[in-house]
Design a protein with these regions (language model features):
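N-terminal beta1-alpha1 cap of cysteine-dependent amidohydrolase-like domains
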Residues: 1-118, 128-129, 136, 140-172, ...
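Conserved G/P- and acidic residue-centered "switch" motifs that form tight phosphate/ATP-binding loops
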Residues: 121
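Hydrophobic, aromatic-enriched interface-forming segments
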Residues: 124-126
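Active-site-proximal beta-strand elements of phosphoester/diester hydrolases
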Residues: 218-221
Length: 260
């Protein structure tokens, strides 16, 4: 059977937490990811593979990406502000430098090889910082409320306005505004070169960006995995991963942006 055929489900890598965790009698440092992430990929037609933080060297991220058709940078703790030249705000999480370095290497490698990827919440911030942008470390000081960070493990609901052009607007077509689930206290401040904003909140908070040089390189500030009835963004990633794999098998070249 042709392993490059369209009947083969795309393999999507998802980054994970690496935190102290409890299960049964055990209280250990462990890699984990809420099941809603890989459930969404499975329901969208992909195979989910988990990618816990690894020691980063010049080749390890590339070898991992060799085995993937697509990538998701998932939600989690704040990016270390040292990565964008700032001291930590009082509310900023203690740094997870292993995860920061791992996800930076993965997302940089994905962009270099045109591997379709999707950043979610922290994933949007990782992308912006990896490409040279900065973050607002405590959004309530900017917008004057905790509308995006209710706390207590409760997602807040916010309306975002979707742009007219781009991959995200194309996937969410006929949806000029969207009620989304939010859980973040940071946001993009200075947008990195090579990224385009494709969704915002009414207070100006950037809610979606795309990599200009890619056929499918998107990130959103909200948590689409929390809406099990709307798989459009996950289906878009799975479809792009399948198309990219088929293009590579047929021509040796990855999927290109429509304008390329």
């Amino acid at each position: 059977m042709d392993s490059s055929g369209s009947n083969q489900k795309p393999i999507i890598g998802l980054t994970t937490y690496l935190e102290q965790a409890q299960t049964g009698v055990w209280d250990v440092r462990a890699a984990f990811l809420p099941a809603v992430y890989f459930d969404a990929i499975n329901r969208a037609g992909g195979i989910a593979v988990l990618l816990p933080p690894q020691p980063v060297d010049s080749g390890i991220a590339s070898r991992v990406l060799d085995g993937l058709d697509g990538l998701i940078i998932t939600g989690g703790k704040d990016v270390d502000p040292a990565r964008y030249g700032q001291e930590p705000h009082a509310t900023t999480d203690d740094p997870r430098r292993d995860r920061d370095a791992w996800e930076d290497a993965l997302i940089t490698g994905a962009i270099d090889r045109q591997l379709p990827f999707f950043g979610i919440c922290r994933g949007l911030q990782v992308l912006n910082v990896a490409r040279g942008g900065t973050l607002n470390q405590h959004l309530p000081e900017i917008v004057g409320s905790t509308r995006y960070s209710a706390g207590g493990g409760t997602f807040s609901v916010n309306e975002v306005t979707i742009g007219e052009n781009g991959v995200v607007p194309g996937l969410l077509r006929d949806t000029p505004t969207l009620d989304v689930k939010s859980y973040h206290h940071q946001s993009i401040d200075r947008l990195a070169d090579g990224l385009t904003v494709t969704a915002r909140s009414d207070d100006g908070t950037i809610q979606a960006v795309e990599v200009d040089s890619m056929g499918f390189g998107i990130a959103v500030q909200w948590h689409p995995e929390q809406d099990g009835d709307d798989l459009r963004l996950f289906s878009g990633l799975v479809d792009a991963a399948r198309t990219n794999r088929e293009n590579l098998a047929r021509t040796g070249k990855p999927q290109q942006p429509e304008s390329a």
